Amino acid sequence: MKQVLKVAVSFLMLWAAVLHAEVRIEITQGVDSARPIGVVPFKWAGPGAAPEDVGAIVGADLRNSGKFNPIDANRMPQQPATASEVTPAAWTALGIDAVVVGQVQPSADGSYLVSYQLVDTSGNPGNVLAQNQFKVTKQWLRYAAHTASDEVFEKLSGIKGAFRTRIAYVVQTNGGQFPYELRVADYDGYNQFVVHRSPQPLMSPAWSADGSKLAYVTFESGRSALVIQTLANGAIRQVASFPRHNGAPSFSPDGSKLAFALSKSGSLNLYVMNLGSGQISPVTDGRSNNTEPTWFPDSQTLAYTSDQAGRPQVYKVNANGGAPQRVTWEGSQNQDSDVSADGKFLVTVSSNGGAQHISKLDLVTGAVQVLTDTFLDETPSIAPNGTMVIYSSKQGLGSVLQLVSTDGRFKARLPATDGQVKFPAWSPYL
């Protein structure tokens, strides 16, 4: 836990303003078909009320994954705090084969000891499948809960949890000196803070491979420019400000390169910068428009959008150049793709018959699945464990963030309370 906290502490920046108007997940579809589980309210072993409802956070995480459906506390046959207090038969009677129990205990030094146990109620009744404890200060209680959620999720699903990840996005507010804000929040919308404020548009945030930096597009100089901002100290480095368009940054998974699109020669084309030397090399060169690069896990191959066949479609090409290969064939156009961390699938904005939705393309079988049914969907970004996609869509007169599971069954919304929200980007594991 200490090592994890060292990584996460870089986000507690003195210069960042923590916001109260936060986005929160509202589930809209799919939790009823998920696996039932018991997450018992964690026992509070101190005076007064607990500073955080850790059990509720764990339950919300598991529910937000789309793979689990925690039962309501009023339906629980008992509320044990330890594995030894669990009566397995009482839970299996409700169709529940695993129960999470835990407690939070205050310490004399002002810290808190958070402990949990994951208990099997059917296969080997009473067996503890996973357990851990974390000593944290008050501000890290939510993080401790997310850590427990990650461990429970991985034990039960075999998939690494992503509840300690973050999302970056751009918020446009009405009026004020700085109506554009680049913000970062926990994956569930909590602990939101401002990374950068601007009087001019901000676009296309992209995370570095280690989660310590964000690249994005700014128009503060009067024209587009690409910058990289270090989250720990706020330092901003300009990496591209050529004539015409500079946009669509994407860090390679190995952290050594940044791909982006420039139109300095007329048409939009892809370029790659070596982040060590600063050298910029062209990837594509032609009269068609080539943009929106995203990396495959080998850090050598790019998926991107091109109109070389007339309408926008997704292609792939070696980052050192070479002949492009078309990837998408279904739908009148496909654009703004994101490749999963394992390289097995990509998601894209697909247009067909006037509709614009997020689709998933299985890169092994070629199967295509439309994941969303919202309006004018844009800019999908895949969670690092490949289970969820965050994207923006139109709702009323504004833009909001939406979540959909990569099997299409679970859907949720993160409604904004103080502006239009666009360009979501899911962080790597932190």
From Swiss-Prot:
Keyword Cell cycle: yes
A Pfam family matched in the record: PD40
UniProt keyword annotation of Cell division present: yes
One of the protein's GO biological processes: protein import
Gene3D superfamilies: TolB, C-terminal domain (2.120.10.30), TolB, N-terminal domain (3.40.50.10070)
Organism: Pectobacterium atrosepticum (strain SCRI 1043 / ATCC BAA-672)
Function: Part of the Tol-Pal system, which plays a role in outer membrane invagination during cell division and is important for maintaining outer membrane integrity. TolB occupies a key intermediary position in the Tol-Pal system because it communicates directly with both membrane-embedded components, Pal in the outer membrane and TolA in the inner membrane.
SUPFAM superfamilies, A to Z: TolB, N-terminal domain (SSF52964), Tricorn protease N-terminal domain (SSF69304)
Protein name as annotated: Tol-Pal system protein TolB
Family, similarity comment: Belongs to the TolB family.
Keywords, ordered alphabetically: Cell cycle, Cell division, Periplasm, Signal
Cellular component per GO, a single term: periplasmic space
Signal peptide: 1-21
Subcellular localization(s) per the UniProt record: Periplasm
